[in-house]
Amino acid sequence: MKAHINGIDVRYTVTGSGPWITLSHSLACRLEMWDEEVKHLSKNFTVLAYDSRGHGESGAPAVPYTLDMISDDIKGLLDHVGAMQTHWIGLSMGGVFGLHASLKYPGLFETLVLADTSSKLLPEGVQAFKDRVATVKASGMEAMVEPTLKRWFKDSFRAKSPNLMDKVGRWIRTTPLDGYIGCSAAIPTVDVTDRLHEITVPCMVMVGADDIAMPPVMAETLDRHLPESQLVVIPDAGHLSNLEQSGAFNSALARFYKHY
């Protein structure tokens, strides 16, 4: 399905019934990143998955993207589907978006799951985004496929998961150039560590133990500053922990949501 939200068409799916849960994917991915989570969560929840601005089959205008703009995308989509409040699961970029939207729209999220993400990037992380933007401007998205897979997944997992690597590689390769550039400019502007105390809903911070893109120290910072938080470190997982250790990721979600 698609809806015209905040000036762009947004592709989304709604599955199951019960309280709302919204799933927000990583940079250069798409809503299919959440297929396993949709399958599990839709037994007890109404699950909204969507392609973020600039990704998948959603609009990718060649304009500057901001976290405020993306928060408005989220609020507009939730209004469109009739979700007054939702649980939020965001991984990497999706976690950044969830943090910003929760501060811009207090009360919108009943809980937050923040996976492999951060409330503020280190200077070298900001520079890395600038370098990747320069690369795709010069050479296109194909130049991002192998470096991104290597950064996101451990070599041992890549070697035994060729079909998944092909799939994720296609997601990266087909991400609209303007969307990748736009979101890569917006993400590094996140700087909300000093405001995390304002997010008083229950949170679960998750991170792959071997994540080098958003390492565990960033998750520990989130967990330390959020008033009601629990930290789950997923062994033997890199950046896309829901794909590398699907069983452990979904078991943690099941424990977190058992009271909702």
How would you label these PLM feature ranges?
Residues K120-Q127, S139-H197:
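Conserved alpha/beta-hydrolase catalytic His-Asp/Glu region
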Residues I199, V205-V207:
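Short beta-strand/loop motif that positions the catalytic acidic residue
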Residues A209-M214:
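Acidic catalytic loop of the alpha/beta-hydrolase fold
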Residues G90, G94, G98:
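Gly/Ala-rich beta-loop-alpha elbow adjacent to hydrolase catalytic centers
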Residues L99-K104, L108-S139:
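Flexible "cap/lid" loop of the alpha/beta hydrolase fold
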Residues S229-Y260:
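Catalytic active-site module of serine/aspartate enzymes centered on a nucleophile-bearing elbow/loop
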Residues E36-K39, L48-I89, S251:
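Active-site loop/oxyanion-hole signature of alpha/beta-hydrolase fold enzymes
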Residues I8-A60:
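Conserved HGGG/HGGXW glycine-rich cap/lid loop of the alpha/beta-hydrolase fold
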